[in-house]
Amino acid sequence: MRRQCRVLVTGAGSGVGQGIVKALRVSGLPVTVVATDIAPMNVALYRAEEAVLIPRVEASGALDVIVRLLQQHKIDVVMIGSEFDLSFFSANRQEIESRSGAIVIAASPRTVAIADDKWLTAEFLCENGLPYAEAYLPSDAADAGRIADAWGYPIVLKTRRGTSSRHVYIVKSRDELLRLYPETPMPMLQRLIDIPTSHLGSEYTCSVFKTAAGRMIGPFTARRTVRGGTSWHIEVAAFEALHAPLLAIAGAVDYIGSLNVQLMLTEQGAIPFELNARFSGTTAVRAHFGFNEPAMALLSFFYKEELPTPEVRSGIAMRYYEEVLIEDVRMDSITPGQHKGKVNPWF
């Protein structure tokens, strides 16, 4: 019989954090979820078994406070639900584990740095002989215009660092490029692979899981549409044309747990444009269809079991909005860990 595992999820109210919690709930494993976030107005704090506020990772003394919380709450495993926390837990992983006894599911600092920087991602793919979309770092707007004119429009102007499609533009003319360039932090140019659409087309969200022993599980493949930077309609199927390139990418990356790959499938084959060495916003969808990465992380890193090959079913997921309702409380008195929210079965 497996022993109870206490899992702390950072950023538990974010899209990724919610996905981790949902996946743990359907895993069938003996798990107690301790939801954390930096502010009390966060839904996961009122839906998990336990909840606690943690400091921003960039705050002075955050490391000592977080280690103390892990000790106080007897945490066995830490899962990162906020991408803003990932660099911190990656850089401090060894110290956190040695001081608290908790296992931190986070890739190496170098891998996190590559995944966080879209320019470094393109460079990594190129250097490893993997498919990629050509990218360029302009010195200024005039230089950007010169390269864009040579490549031809449309092209992609985007920030090197960013999430949820913020500061990502498909630029159709030189005038548009020169207008948007000053508004784009850490700008880079990239050749356009394909134009995203509102229907299921050529864009995919995929994953390969790597166990504690370095064995690769998967890949998981799904086609998607995107709304507000989030996967909105998701078609899960065994898109076999993606399997070989995904395993090649995973084999080149130094990571543990989940590696998410966003890519386009073109006439030239699969071309990745983003890597994320963390759990995904579609974690719950993957778990439902049989590819439960938080469960695999616990089985491999905590329970130290050999993982079976998951049987992934096909299907479609559609996102929608939901409310968490907390009765008889005011803003100035709401307290994580004391108040509980409910979700009505009305839809």
Which ranges hold each PLM region?
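Short glycine-enriched loops at secondary-structure junctions
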Residues: D37-P40, E83-D85, R110, T211-R215, ...
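Conserved metal-phosphate-binding beta-hairpin within the catalytic cores
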Residues: G251-H288
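ATP-binding N-terminal substructure of ATP-dependent carboxylate-amine bond-forming enzymes
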Residues: M1-I105
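Peripheral (often C-terminal) accessory segments that flank ATP-dependent C-N-forming ligase machineries
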Residues: A295-F347
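Phosphate-binding site of ATP-dependent enzymes
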Residues: K172-V253, M264-L265, G269-I271
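Active-site nucleotide/adenylate-binding loops and adjacent lid/helix of ATP-dependent enzymes
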Residues: V112-Y204, A212-R215
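Glycine-rich phosphate/pyrophosphate-binding beta-alpha loops
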Residues: S165, T225-I234, N276-G290
